[in-house]
């Protein structure tokens, strides 16, 4: 089976380094799938789930809050603003953060505060979708 090297790095840590057979991520233009032999590219990532199929067939689900995906002939690099494995996300805390963001939207009239609440809400929704994808694959 053909593989390529992959590194997934956040500002805090390296989450993954090894051989993969496939990576699926949420780009700004939609979902993008990377297989060995993919054309080189650089694209921005939007918040959401990233699925990585390792060379031994295991699948990892990772939440990224945004970042950059670079594809080279034998290497995929993800530089994420924030990245966490789906099983490490705390669903109850995320639901609470979503409720707080929704409440902020109701109570705010300031454009800056509304934009901050919308960003927080979008991040919470993306994290919850990542958790659902992780649970559905198990």
Curated annotation (Swiss-Prot):
Subcellular location: Cell inner membrane
Assembly: F-type ATPases have 2 components, CF(1) - the catalytic core - and CF(0) - the membrane proton channel. CF(1) has five subunits: alpha(3), beta(3), gamma(1), delta(1), epsilon(1). CF(0) has three main subunits: a, b and c.
Function field: Produces ATP from ADP in the presence of a proton gradient across the membrane.
Pfam families referenced in this protein's UniProt entry, alphabetically: ATP-synt_DE_N
CDD domains for this protein: F1-ATPase_delta (cd12152)
Protein name stated in the entry: ATP synthase epsilon chain
Organism name: Psychrobacter arcticus (strain DSM 17307 / VKM B-2377 / 273-4)
Membrane topology qualifier: Peripheral membrane protein
GO CC terms, sorted: plasma membrane; proton-transporting ATP synthase complex
InterPro entries given in the database record: ATP_F1_dsu/esu_C_sf, ATP_synth_F1_dsu/esu, ATP_synth_F1_dsu/esu_N, ATPsynth_dsu/esu_N
Key words of the record: ATP synthesis, Cell inner membrane, Cell membrane, CF(1), Hydrogen ion transport, Ion transport, Membrane, Transport
Family designation: Belongs to the ATPase epsilon chain family.
Superkingdom as given in the UniProt entry: Bacteria
GO MF term (any one): ATP binding
């Amino acid at each position: 089976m053909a593989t390529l090297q992959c590194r997934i790095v956040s500002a805090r840590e390296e989450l993954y380094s090894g051989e993969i057979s496939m990576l699926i991520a949420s780009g700004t233009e939609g979902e993008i799938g990377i297989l060995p032999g993919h054309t080189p590219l650089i694209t921005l990532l939007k918040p959401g789930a990233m699925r990585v199929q390792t060379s031994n067939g295991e699948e990892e689900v990772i939440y990224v809050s945004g970042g950059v995906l670079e594809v080279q002939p034998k290497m995929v690099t993800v530089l994420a603003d924030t990245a966490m494995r789906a099983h490490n996300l705390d669903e109850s805390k995320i639901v609470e953060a979503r409720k707080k963001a929704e409440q902020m939207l109701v109570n705010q009239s300031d454009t800056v505060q509304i934009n901050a609440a919308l960003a927080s809400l979008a991040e919470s929704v993306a994290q919850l979708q990542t958790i659902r994808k992780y649970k559905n694959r198990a």
